[in-house]
UniProtKB/Swiss-Prot annotation:
Species this chain originates from: Arabidopsis thaliana (Mouse-ear cress)
Designated name of the protein: Kinesin-like protein KIN-5A
Annotated keywords: ATP-binding, Coiled coil, Cytoplasm, Cytoskeleton, Microtubule, Motor protein, Nucleotide-binding
Residue spans of biased composition, Polar residues class: 32-41
PROSITE patterns, per database record: KINESIN_MOTOR_1, KINESIN_MOTOR_2
Length: 1042
């Protein structure tokens, strides 16, 4: 955490001011610290020492007392416990923490210091580096605990003095009490503000005196796992008052501010370090210097910005404070969990405290908390981190002590450095040194020279003293060697005598034990012999009983053999009789075969008649299919005629339209010629032309009505033809197979859909014809052509796809035909109703056109003045209409011709497909007939071996079965002998046959096992007293065992 910690002995100079040089040099003349008393044992050093954690609770402040704020914290100083009351989900829950020491709100500064801090000061004087830092929320008394109240003018320590002044006073009291000891103290005061290090003891430069600017310091690694602050000012102090002045000087420079939680809140972390050097003499007379360091850290408190009221710069300060404290908490967690990575480098605070947390420094944490309920969350956080910090282990080590020669060398290098500074100041070539410092350094040099001279004199005296002590030591060593030789001889003789006595006692004990073992073996052998005799008598009785039972069993076996011989002869006789009966039964079965042959001949005749009937039915089916083909051809031809009529009507309609358009064009030309001669004549001609157009449109409407009537008649004729076709199909439906019925059903559905689409097309044409005559005819022809093509293509595809499935779907044709009849009739009625609706719509359109004509006459009167402009537009319009109408009419005629050609080719293709389908049907029927004939032949060849007279067989079979039953009952029921009980057969009983294991158990165990059991059964008391008893009483005689 500090530079002295990392440098250890190399940073210690003389009792005067230590130079602020950053040079490090290795020393080969260190004295091992283990030569002096070390309060840390080797075991403790290896395992580590837990950080000491102390909790202090502040009392309520005036504001909290005025508001009567409830307390949530209870401190038990005796049990060292802190209990926090929480209200979670309406339940009162207490959380208890256990710490090393606990100080309640009523505790005094002196109590905390004497119980917790005072032992640490003694460890610092023993050569350890120790750290004490206060941790907690802002406003909980950290600075008060570390620094306390203002010092009295007379220099006495006030009652509310904190840890720092009391520790300083204790150090000087102890050092001054050791009058013979020489010592020196150095202090440094460091501030960490917004992650920048500042030396609070550095002298301020004149030009920055007004704004109190503070130069930031650099934090450097020392290469040994520690850190040091480059350029940190260290002041030599010789009295406690000087330290108090230094403390007041640095505290005045610390950054503080007022917040809602604290009137004087510290906005930075501060580290006050006291370094002590004490000179000691070794038993060899060598002068060494031991060093210890006390770091007193006052951390800025964590705060909630919303509660503290921090804004802008204060908010940034609070953020930096919370960030560094959060990193400190993460370091504590990582150390407790023994994590592989400890985030020391994430904050300068944790880098400075690195040796205090998990390092070689003894550390004490004073956690300050508030009892107020408003600070419950912060209090719990502080207590949780403090409780975790308890488990952090440090491995404190005593600082290495420096020999006098090392100090002398450092002093010489310091003198050389000071000489260079003086020379540079004299020549004005270097760094300026203040007069006060120059005077002080000169005085220190003189004092140092005097001390060096004094040390040399003392060194010579010590050398003489060491020589005298060495001579005394050598003489004492000679006397001790003579006494040690005599003692060794006496001890050797005593040892030999004791060994001889032990050998004799061992031999006597072994002899007594051997006699007891032999007696124990003999007693076990006699016991085994007696057991064997008793067991042999029991086995002799069991053997006699078994012999009697065996004789009775042999007698019973003889009786059973006689009965078995008689039963064997009886069974042989029964077998011969049974064979004779079975032979008779076989003869009767053979006689019945001839009768069954006659029955099978009759069956063959029946099959022949079946085949002939099947042939006649096939011929009838073939004729029905021929009639079906003729009817189908008739329907297709009628469709062809309908299409031809439709084509003729369309051509005539188009020709009429063309003539009307031509007439209309001529009339327009004549009318416009008349207009050029006279406007009045033009108006009359226009009116007459309009009348002519009205008449022609009426005639055209009547013509379209007649055309639609003819189309409706054609549709009705198609419906009549289809109805006749369905009636004819119904008469032959029962004679057709499954194949023809389904194909015709599909064709009927296709024709029905075609008729429906055709009627819908006619209705649509009637609605649109009055609006656009030429465009309607062209689209009508196109739709008609498309409908016919779709219908013909569907019929063709249906005929080709359904031919293969006719043999599986024919049975459902009759029901489908009847349902289609009903649907066809309904379609006819619906088409007629649609025709009537269309006629009424045409009449309405006619009335609308008449109205429009009247309106046109009225408009013509108002357009007389604009006839010149309209003449040119009408002429152009006439030309465009004539050209458009001609192109439309020619396209319609060409489309009708193509439609006629495609329709005829489709009909011829359909007829050829139907012929091929009929041929395939007839071929399949012939194949079926041939298969029936083959099946009849196979049946005749199979049933020939099965002819037999079943009636005679049944009669003879019954007689033979009755006779066999009678013989079986006589043989097995009356003549078969049974073994009767004589009550002389011995009953089953259990024999006590000894097992191999039980026989083995009767054997006497081996001598080794007996001896082992003998030794195991001896009690501790017998083992202790047995030898003495045997020696005094002797062994018992063997006759007593027998």
């Amino acid at each position: 955490m500090d530079s002295n910690n990392s440098k250890k002995g190399s940073s210690v100079k003389s009792p005067c001011q230590t130079p602020r040089s950053t040079e490090k040099s290795n020393r080969d003349f260190r004295v091992d610290s283990n030569s002096n008393s070390n309060p840390v044992s080797k075991n403790e050093k290896e395992k580590g020492v837990n950080i000491q954690v102390i909790v202090r609770c502040r009392p309520f402040n005036s504001e909290e007392t005025r508001l009567q704020t409830p307390a949530v914290l209870t401190c038990n100083d005796r049990k060292k416990e802190v209990a926090v009351a929480q209200n979670i989900a309406g339940k009162q829950i207490d959380k208890t923490f256990l710490f090393d020491k606990v100080f309640g709100p009523t505790s005094q500064q002196k109590d905390l210091y004497h119980q917790a801090v005072s032992p640490i000061v003694f460890e610092v004087l023993d050569g350890y580096n120790c750290t004490i830092f206060a941790y907690g929320q802002t406003g909980t008394g950290k600075t008060y605990t570390m620094e306390g109240g203002a010092r009295k003018k007379n220099g006495e320590i006030p009652s509310d003095a904190g840890v720092i002044p009391r520790a300083v006073k204790q150090i000087f009291d102890i050092l001054e009490a050791q009058s013979a000891a020489e010592y020196s103290l150095k202090v440094s005061f460091l501030e960490l503000y917004n992650e920048e290090l500042t030396d609070l003891l550095a002298p301020e430069e004149t030009k920055f005196a007004d704004d109190k600017s503070k130069k930031p310091l650099a934090l450097m690694e020392d290469g040994k796992g520690g850190v040091f602050v480059r350029g940190l000012e260290e002041e030599i102090v010789s009295t406690a008052d000087e330290i108090y002045k230094v403390l007041e000087k640095g505290s005045a420079k610390r950054r503080t501010a007022e917040t809602l939680l604290n009137k004087q809140s510290s906005r930075s972390h501060s580290i006050f370090s006291v370094t002590i050097h004490i000179k000691e003499c070794t038993p060899e007379g060598e002068e060494i210097v031991k060093s210890g360091k006390l770091n007193l850290v006052d951390l800025a408190g964590s705060e909630n910005i919303s509660r503290s009221g921090a804004r802008e710069g204060r908010a940034r300060e609070a953020g930096e404070i919370n960030k560094s404290l959060l990193t400190l908490g993460r370091v504590i967690n990582a150390l407790v969990e023994h994590s592989g990575h400890i985030p020391y480098r994430e904050s300068k605070l944790t880098r400075l405290l690195r040796d205090s947390l998990g390092g070689k420094t003894k550390t004490c944490v004073i956690a300050t908390v508030s009892p107020s309920v408003h600070c419950l969350e912060e209090t719990l956080s502080t207590l949780d981190y403090a409780h975790r910090a308890k488990h952090i282990k440090n491995k404190p080590e005593v600082n290495q002590k420096m020999m006098k020669s090392a100090i002398m060398k450092d002093l010489y290098s310091e003198i050389e450095r000071l000489k260079q500074e003086v020379y540079a100041a004299r020549e004005k070539n270097g760094i300026y040194i203040p007069k006060e410092r120059y005077t002080q350094e000169e005085a220190e040099k003189k004092a140092m020279a005097d001390k060096i001279e004094q040390m040399e004199v003392e060194g010579e005296a010590k050398d003489k003293q060491i020589i005298d002590l060495q001579e005394l030591y050598n003489s004492e060593q000679l006397v001790t060697a003579g006494l040690r030789e005599k003692l060794d001889k006496t001890e050797k003789k005593l040892y030999e005598t004791e060994q001889a006595l032990l050998d004799l006692e061992e031999k006597h004990r072994q002899a007594v034990a051997t006699i007891k073992e032999k007696e124990y073996l003999i007693s076990n052998l006699l016991k085994s012999e007696k057991t064997l005799v008793d067991r042999a008598v029991e086995l002799q009785a069991e053997l006699a009983n078994a012999a009697s039972d065996v004789s009775n069993l042999f007698a019973k076996i003889g009786r059973k053999d006689k009965i078995e011989d008689s039963n064997r002869s009886l069974i042989q006789d029964f077998q011969s009789q049974l064979l004779r009966q079975l032979e008779l039964l076989n003869n009767s079965v053979a006689g019945s075969v001839s009768q069954q042959e006659k029955q099978l001949q009759d069956m063959e005749n029946v099959m022949v008649s079946f085949v002939s009937a099947k042939t006649k039915a096939t011929e009838t089916l073939r004729g029905s299919l021929a009639q079906l083909k003729e009817k189908y051809n008739t329907g297709i031809k009628s469709l062809d005629d309908i299409a031809g009529n439709l084509d003729k009507d369309s051509q005539s309609t188009l020709n009429d339209l063309n003539s009307e358009v031509t007439k209309h064009s001529c009339a327009l030309e004549d009318m416009f010629k008349g207009f050029t001669s006279e406007a009045y004549t033009l108006l009359e001609g226009l009116q007459g032309s309009l009348h002519n157009q009205e008449e022609k449109l009426s005639a055209f409407t009547q013509q379209q009505r007649d055309l639609h009537s003819r189309s409706m008649d054609s549709a009705k004729s198609v419906s009549t033809v289809m109805l006749d076709f369905f009636k004819t199909l119904d008469t032959h439906a029962n004679k057709l197979t499954k194949l023809a019925e389904d194909a015709q059903n599909v064709n009927e559905q296709k024709l029905s859909a075609f008729t429906k689409k055709f009627e819908e097309s006619i209705a649509n044409e009637e609605k649109q014809m009055l609006e656009k005559v030429a465009e309607l005819l062209a689209s009508s022809n196109a739709r008609k052509k498309e409908l016919v093509q779709i219908a013909v293509q569907d019929i063709r595809q249906g005929s080709s796809s359904q031919t293969g499935a006719l043999q599986q779907e024919m049975s459902a044709m009759q029901d489908s035909a009847s349902s289609i009849k009903v649907q066809w009739n309904s379609h006819i009625v619906q088409a007629e109703s649609h025709h009537l609706d269309n006629i009424s719509a045409v009449e309405v359109a006619k009335e609308d056109m008449q109205k429009m004509h009247l309106k046109c006459l009225e408009n013509s009167k108002t357009g007389t003045q604009q006839w010149k402009t309209a003449q040119e537009s009408l002429v152009d319009l006439e030309k465009r209409n004539v050209a458009t109408a001609d192109s439309i009419i020619r396209g319609a005629i060409e489309n009708n011709e193509k439609l006629r050609t495609q329709f005829s080719s489709a009909v011829s293709t359909t007829l050829s497909d139907v012929d091929s389908s009929n041929r395939e049907i007839i071929s399949s029927i012939d194949n079926s007939l041939q298969l029936d004939k083959d099946a009849s032949t196979d049946v005749n060849s199979t049933i020939v071996p099965c002819s037999e007279n079943l009636k005679e067989l049944r009669t003879h079979h019954d007689d033979n079965v009755v006779e066999i039953k009678q013989n079986t009952g006589k043989c097995l029921g009356h003549e078969y002998k049974v073994d009767e009980a004589t009550s002389s057969t011995p009953r089953k009983r259990e024999y006590n046959i000894p097992t191999v294991g039980s026989i083995e158990e009767l054997k006497t165990p081996s001598f080794e096992e007996l001896l082992k059991a003998f030794h195991d059964c001896k009690s501790p008391k017998q083992m202790q007293n047995g030898e003495a008893k045997h020696v005094s009483n002797g062994r018992p005689p063997l006759t007593a065992i027998n």
